[in-house]
């Protein structure tokens, strides 16, 4: 089950500050994410670890969790060496601690939103990231697109054996 383990520490407030060396950076290619191996598991990599492979990648602030900024970007895979490798995003289910899996899953959903809204739904023009908020702006008609929140609740109602 995906539940925010610490809602008081999670912030979706957009931060336009450029990426810093210690920021967590999740680079996605389709349904894969670049992770760093750590023993028998994987950890979310820092900018200093992935920048040598992708020095020109455009990364965007996704969210902040407990003073830890998480950035996201879309890349084409390259031959990686060392501890870095692309893994299926479903790996979020086995990452430890559980908060790492939660962070990866939220970042993946935002990454998919950016990747699937590269063009305007009104006129078809190319979009670009808004400089001060989490939005995409059409370069032709100026339409502003925000991520859609689709909450869901699953409930089971029981009455004994019925």
Feature annotation, model-predicted:
Residues 125-128, 146:
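Short functional micro-motifs and their immediate structural scaffolds
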Residues 132, 136-162:
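N-terminal strand-loop-strand
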Residues 114-117, 124, 135:
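Residues immediately within or flanking Cys/His clusters that coordinate Zn2+
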Residues 106:
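Phosphate-interacting basic helix/loop segments used at nucleotide- and nucleic-acid interfaces
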Residues 1-97:
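N-terminal alpha-helical interaction blocks
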